[in-house]
Amino acid sequence: MSSAEALAFDVIVIGGGHAGCEAASAAARAGARTALVTHRFDTIGVISCNPAIGGLGKGHLVREIDALDGLMGRVADRAGIQFRLLNRRKGPAVRGPRTQADRKLYRLAIQQMITEQENLTVVEGGAADLVCDGERISGVTLADGRVLKCGAVVLTTGTFLNGLIHIGEKRFPAGRMGEKPALGLSERLLSFGFTLGRLKTGTPPRLDGRTIDWQSLDMQSADEEPVPFSLMTDRITTPQIECGITRTTPETHDIIRANLHRSAMYSGSIEGIGPRYCPSVEDKIVKFGDRDGHQIFLEPEGLDDDTVYPNGISTSLPEDVQLEILKTIPGLEKAVLLQPGYAIEYDFIDPRELKRSLETRKVCGLFLAGQINGTTGYEEAGAQGLLAGLNAARRAAGSEPVILQRTEAYIGVMVDDLTSRGVSEPYRMFTSRAEFRLSLRADNADQRLTPLADEVGILSKERRKRYLTRETALSHARMVTQSLSITPNLAGYYDLRLNQDGVRRSAYDLLSYPDINLDRLIAIWPELASIDPVTREALEIEAQYAVYMERQQSDIAVMEREERLLIPSGLDFDAISGLSNELKQKLKQRKPETIAEAQRVDGMTPAAVALLIAQIRKFGGRQKLAAETLEGKGAA
């Protein structure tokens, strides 16, 4: 790293968390000479808070990261110690794969992948400043004075950007417990004209599992047949563990109420807004004080680690109050506190400052991913990191960006939400955020996104081969089941109750019936028994949703047409007669590039959209649709 040549890269990624690792890996896979700048190599891939990956909505993101040949799914499969498929009894569209992860195994697995990745160099050091050539990023200055030159930068600072930890009345600068914050970068971002805000998150105390009375607790087991995240994982081999379940008590609540004035959250010390769906225990007691207790999951942090994460009691109360609280919780009366819970505040940038490529609008070549964009969660961060890293590599190479639409992926939904609506609190993914969740299922992420990954050059040969093998098997099974048919009368002999309308139905059609699966059809057509279990499940889900998917495709087509209807860059919003001054101002500030994007501007009504479309036609005549996409303009 001593020569000038060694200090030049195509892409520099700042931060070695979940967003940074995915960004660095994606950029390197895309062929960019990539540097991952982090304070210390041994902190790459650290799970800062909850030792779990996936869940409702989040599991979909992990599957999509994996479909794009990212790291998180494979790493979680190696490190997972309690796999559970959430919403198993509900439809496949809302099922959420989740695993509790061994912190050490997770960190070591991702560090190994980073080390083995071609085109990727880890640079230990702190990023002190961003270097620009006019309005274009050109490098990064490190705290020790080194200057790294580049064509694009991905900033993934997590909670480190002006991070401030709160434990009761105490507060001190930190990125997370025991690590220095990133100072100075906020001032540089402000100098670029970005709008910064403060957000907050928190974490519970860590406990010594040897001092917990496990015998008095209910226990939750892992699934008997763990469902992996990654297409590349044949089966889970890591030992699976149980978690304990306990609850807070009225005595717990009394202690919290009596000490609310000492909580950083309620004393006025914290300015940042916390995540709505991960409230502190103080919030739970204040907002849901009528409940007798709140559930706590006691999650071991590793196979050879006695540390336990009590999921459900995130707090910023003083350490002495935290100790008193533990004494009132069944099973934790004698628990030893290894690390107090705390809240942490950090800077973020209004994500409306970003294009959908995750490149900033103000500085060419500067990309942002993760909590700096106002999101919360490893999965949200990793998904943004992958997209930002890929597009940073493409920016450095002079190629057009990759834009994921809302109709294509949960990643597209998230990025569109962030860049068009912004955030008033930390954003997390739910299946309910997607209009087309029947087609955006966790089980079909590979079908939706792996061909794209192959097209843009970030897919490994091994994954391509495995994907094509699976798709060939599914295509063959589909063809076979569509070629086999039966009359309603004959179906009755096999105890299949169909409308007696005389219409023959294929085996594929029959799989759409709620009480019919492949096992029942094998009695009629024994040759179906040769379909392997993985293909069988995929076929059953596909057939189950086939009718609904046909209906949804028309809705998707409407949205895609709106995504392609471009707003000319020179359109004068002030000239649109009938549009309110408020909307004119918002449109000028937001600068939407398509009608679909304009529709998501706060306050836009159907009448306002009609006025905008009329002005577009007056401005430039008939707009090109499919031929002139966002990518073609390079606007995103």
Swiss-Prot record:
Its cofactor is FAD. NAD(+) binds at residues 274-288. GO terms for cellular component: cytosol. FAD binds at G15, G16, G17, H18, A19, G20. GO terms for molecular function: flavin adenine dinucleotide binding. GO terms for biological process: tRNA methylation; tRNA wobble uridine modification. Its main location: cytoplasm. NAD-binding protein involved in the addition of a carboxymethylaminomethyl (cmnm) group at the wobble position (U34) of certain tRNAs, forming tRNA-cmnm(5)s(2)U34. Belongs to the MnmG family. Homodimer. Heterotetramer of two MnmE and two MnmG subunits. This is tRNA uridine 5-carboxymethylaminomethyl modification enzyme MnmG. The lineage of its organism: Bacteria, Pseudomonadati, Pseudomonadota, Alphaproteobacteria, Hyphomicrobiales. The gene is mnmG.
